[in-house]
């Protein structure tokens, strides 16, 4: 439990550093006098939403497979004969190929649904695919790293490095080094592939990742259970992910000037994510311990983790929510953010309440 506490605290600090960088990015996107329009900022949020949905479809529940079965692979196989990450990356890559085929076939639908209210999305539609592929690979590698108790490292790449990549692009755009938004959004599409390469390089050079295409005895033994688990979890993951991003996509599709409205919604979403930082840290730190506890049927440890995480996260969520809600309008005015973003206050309120309820369930 002490190891979980230590890793979750460090992870939370790293995540909040990332949020600080993210808030700086948001300020550059939304401040008065910026080169970015509301539609430009909205397009970046739409890119992230669709890339997240692509990754959920493509990953084929491989992160859940890693979380559940890594203790068995780790216990019964030497590292160089462990084929888990090879299988997971291969299946996810095949899954993304299917996503690309489906995305290409649905281009006419995208034009029909988004052409009027979000023409920017139609213009840059194919540039979402590199972003989605990068996030797919990162999600699988992240799950593997969590199982190796490397949650702090993965949180640094996802929360800090990814936002620093964005910061660099923003600064280059503001200083006119990047001449137009066309180049900016195309480079932005490669930020997720960038952190995927970084995490892979870390695992490779620290000799914590090995590839083998020979089917191991563990894979053969648990094949039916692996398929059953992934089949069961896959639908739940899709529903959960779609519920997180569907609102952004619907706003971009149905509302007049949808990309700009998605930007306003995106600001409220970012403020809501500040509340979730401790939850992300605790989940990433505890997943490997929960997997081991379930394998060993260690019910006292499971009860301790779930109970303590629920109480601590609920208290923290309520406190941060109240602080942000009471100062939302003043913050917009004080920092010189465009007044149009004040309309996101009640969006934050609704999303914040749902986040409090979610965090009250602990690491579930």
Predicted ranges, named:
Residues 48-56, 236, 240, 244, ...:
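Transmembrane helix-bundle signature of multi-pass secondary active exporters and lipid flippases
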Residues 38, 107-128, 259, 324-362:
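Interfacial segments at transmembrane-helix termini and the short loops linking adjacent helices
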Residues 59-75, 147, 268, 272-310:
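Helix-loop junctions and terminal segments of transmembrane helices
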Residues 126, 156-208, 269-272:
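Hydrophobic alpha-helical transmembrane segments
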